Amino acid sequence: MIIYREENEIIKKALENLNIPDRVYIFDTTLRDGEQTPGVSLTPEEKIDIAIKLDDLGVDVIEAGFPVSSLGEQEAIKKICSLNLDAEICGLARAVKKDIDVAIDCGVDRIHTFIATSPLHRKYKLKKSKEEIIDIAVDAIEYIKEHGIRVEFSAEDATRTEIDYLIEVYKKAVDAGADIINVPDTVGVMIPRAMYYLINELKKEIKVPISVHCHNDFGLAVANSLAAVEAGAEQVHCTINGLGERGGNAALEEVVMSLMSIYGVKTNIKTQKLYEISQLVSKYTEIKVQPNKAIVGENAFAHESGIHAHGVLAHALTYEPIPPELVGQKRKIILGKHTGTHAIEAKLKELGIEVGKDINKDQFDEIVKRIKALGDKGKRVTDRDVEAIVEDVVGKLAKKDRVVELEQIAVMTGNRVIPTASVALKIEEEIKKSSAIGVGPVDAAVKAIQKAIGEKIKLKEYHINAITGGTDALAEVIVTLEGYGREITTKAASEDIVRASVEAVIDGINKILAKREK
């Protein structure tokens, strides 16, 4: 695996002389802060399943929830604690005896206790003095330690607290027995330079491990978490997919892969499982992962641009920072209007179709033309679209062998109009026109074609499949025609159902007539 701190001269120089730890501990709070995402409510069974998967992923600490919040929460946390997972199980508790007692009763390994320290919270929420807040924090920590449980202490809204007072609070917390102190950027107001400064100042005074909990209100949660690590923070709070209140929290997958691939910092995470757990959490929370989400989004390793796709096919690192397999993803060449011939040829090969072997150059050119035409209509071309186009192109007779060609078609339909179709066919250099009515536009068009060529060829079966979703889906029409003692099945694909139907019928007619000639 490439480590940019070693390979990239700019990064290497920028990180010189920094106090970056060799190993960072991952504290996952998906089941607590992640569940506080508006609209998310996990059942105890879902929380247990996610906890098992988080443990399998390799997180060091699982914050299983806020025990005092509900009986269901307590039930889930107790069950998680009984599973004997490798991860340390943590419960959140305000610096209040009632909260702490409920957390202790759940059997957690660690209690994450907190009290707000910023001027805003002191004045408007707590209505307490600086000294009173320190006393409350110390009492809570000492009470937890009396029960032999590890303590993580957070000064809520730390990043809007006066720095001298913040240092005093944390020092008193450590003196009371806190095993680790956590610095929450509660409303995400930090910038990386400021976060580095704050953690660096705390490291001078605090002799226990320092953790950070960054919110993403300005889109800086991951950047601030990494800045904290640059200053020496040993633990980072994260959530899967960056879930959390308001703008969310630092995304675990982004933090971990940045630490490993850019900084060369070790974590215990099995990165190949990142995509899998991202999908699981998305399923249970019913919050879709945005396609362009780093690391786990569907487009994270997808390429459409001809230049990019060609580069990736030549050497993956030209347009990818890490191999997709490293996070459980797969590289995707997305076909559309920007796609070049190299990418389309590679996609065909992926689908088991080789140019020069399974299709000729003319057929390949037609396939490219049709794929780009779909892309021009704003459509994302799927593998099934490609297969349908290939089947349609390959299944058609060469132009020189075709007896019937469609010159023109016009269809009229409506709620007060009888469906009517008019066609002009070129049959052995002669133009024949006909019109017909039907129970629908497709029926009218097929009847008009049959009328133009005579009654010797009949439509026996007609099937239509929507290959992809949406009102502009590519439709595949399959028809079975009978004529001259022969039965032929053909297919055609188009976004226009009438057009696909007409092309399938005409292709079938040509095949019957070609066999008749032979």
Curated annotation (Swiss-Prot):
Pathway: Amino-acid biosynthesis; L-leucine biosynthesis; L-leucine from 3-methyl-2-oxobutanoate: step 1/4. Keywords: Amino-acid biosynthesis, Branched-chain amino acid biosynthesis, Leucine biosynthesis, Metal-binding, Transferase. Gene3D superfamilies: 1.10.238.260, 3.30.160.270, Aldolase class I. A divalent metal cation binds at D33, H213, H215, N249. One of its GO terms (biological process) is coenzyme B biosynthetic process. Pfam families: HCS_D2 (PF22617), HMGL-like (PF00682), LeuA_dimer (PF08502). One of its GO terms (molecular function) is 2-isopropylmalate synthase activity. It comes from the Archaea. Its cofactor is a divalent metal cation. Belongs to the alpha-IPM synthase/homocitrate synthase family. This is 2-isopropylmalate synthase. It comes from Methanocaldococcus jannaschii (strain ATCC 43067 / DSM 2661 / JAL-1 / JCM 10045 / NBRC 100440) (Methanococcus jannaschii).
